Amino acid sequence: MPECPCGSRTGYARCCAPIHDGQRQAVTAEELMRSRYAAFVLGRADHLYRSWHPRTRPPEVELAEVRWLGLTVIEVVGGGPEDETGTVEFVARYRGGSLRERSRFARRAGRWMYLDAE
């Protein structure tokens, strides 16, 4: 079983695949962020669109031709199973550089959704 690209060191089939396929929801904001990173790696624009809050979501999600190399979570504030909001700061490395971002998440109808980034 291939390792999940989210960095969990768990097999993809038991980690982010059930979230990508809609079989279960992310329990925390960090889990949603990791599933979104894995979706970028695997070209799962469908998951990126579904997990983006409708208030801030673009009409469609386009994926750039990027070779993603790894993810490091720096800080998580809130975003737990009982929270309504949360932020996750991370560094995503890709061939030729890196992206450092603080993503904001909010619950909508009980589901974690990506809101925007600072």
Where are these regions (language model features)?
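Secreted/processed peptides and extracellular or luminal domains of membrane proteins
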Residues: 10-12, 21-22
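Core segments of small alpha/beta cavity-forming domains
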Residues: 19-60
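Short beta-strand edge/turn micro-motifs at domain boundaries
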Residues: 98-118
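Short Cys/His-rich zinc-binding micro-motifs
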Residues: 1-10
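Beta-strand-connecting loop/turn residues
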Residues: 2, 84, 110-111
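Surface-exposed, charged secondary-structure patches
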Residues: 64-98
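A short beta-strand motif that forms part of the nucleic acid-binding face
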Residues: 19, 92, 118
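Cysteine-centered loop/knuckle micro-motif
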Residues: 14-16
